[in-house]
Amino acid sequence: MICHNQQSSQPPTIKTCSEGQCYKKTWRDHRGTISERGCGCPTVKPGIHISCCASDKCNA
């Protein structure tokens, strides 16, 4: 599986993942809306929105 792997302020990259899922999570803080993409489907704290998916590059 290929997932986007990126922090908000970084250029987008892709990564081959063994977890079988990709995620995209977003939240707001004093800097504005922050997003993060990667492999797997982590548990998140309240106030953080997460979307998990199971196809190549689905977390664009």
UniProtKB/Swiss-Prot annotation:
Keywords, sorted A to Z: Acetylcholine receptor inhibiting toxin, Disulfide bond, Ion channel impairing toxin, Neurotoxin, Postsynaptic neurotoxin, Secreted, Toxin
Cysteines engaged in disulfide bonds, as pairs: C3-C22, C17-C39, C41-C52, C53-C58
PROSITE patterns: SNAKE_TOXIN
Localization: Secreted
Molecular function (Gene Ontology), one example: toxin activity
InterPro entries in the cross-refs: Snake_3FTx, Snake_toxin-like_sf, Snake_toxin_con_site, Toxin_cobra-type
SUPFAM superfamilies cross-referenced by the UniProt entry: Snake toxin-like
Tissue-specificity statement: Expressed by the venom gland.
Main location: secreted
Pfam families found in the cross-reference section: Toxin_cobra-type
UniProt GO cellular component terms: extracellular region
Protein family membership: Belongs to the three-finger toxin family. Short-chain subfamily. Type I alpha-neurotoxin sub-subfamily.
Job description of the protein: Binds to muscle nicotinic acetylcholine receptor (nAChR) and inhibit acetylcholine from binding to the receptor, thereby impairing neuromuscular transmission.
Protein name, as recorded: Three-finger toxin Mnn I
